[in-house]
């Protein structure tokens, strides 16, 4: 039996729309991500478990893990009879890379079970393709960090889908999911088709400055550059309470605050545990909207998807 855990991820990280992503895991050891188990069988089967299993499609063939198995078998040129179990621990439409978790765990589990016939670049390419079936377009800002770990800059060049960006050991990422769903397609549709020149210049400056600050280990500069002029100004209207949370983050002393992916999850970066706890407490009391919501204090997950058994 092979069991793979794939961690949650922050798409965009404010400053890098569609080209930057970061994997995160709670500091308390909670598994914030999906697991897929594979065991040998006489015929294919897929069973769903986990806290958010009720949100999955009724038709098994619409389940992205089924599609991962189907695509992997196509790549291998044969049907591989296995019993799959998806532990859906991630809310769908949360902005935490939920579909990426399932895709990464599903494909990596099949690859491990079959003795790693596919290399990392090939497998990552397939992950982006499968993710595209869910979100409507091929993109790697969730699957790359989820699979490889840490913070990933998406390059999409032959042989270089992404490259690792060094993070900051002191940073704590407070993640708050309010318990409501935001459709990625809807969040994309709200964005303008064209941007003003000054916004393009600001975006280029912010992203270049952030990447430079990461590589030269200047955390205060990196935090200053974490500004989103591409998506956040438009998506805020889809996120009840985000503007108040961003102001609270500033008042409490967080280094930066932004939308995780297309939302509704937000993240706040803090450089000490006391500030992170205060931020988490505020979000727990003011940003969560129902019992499905949660807050986790996280660090960058540098390991990425990994074997649990």
Curated annotation (Swiss-Prot):
GO terms for cellular component: cytoplasm. The keyword ATP-binding applies. Its EC number is 2.7.1.39. One of its GO terms (biological process) is threonine biosynthetic process. GO terms for molecular function: ATP binding; homoserine kinase activity. Pathway: Amino-acid biosynthesis; L-threonine biosynthesis; L-threonine from L-aspartate: step 4/5. HAMAP family: Homoser_kinase. This is Homoserine kinase. It comes from Yersinia enterocolitica serotype O:8 / biotype 1B (strain NCTC 13174 / 8081).
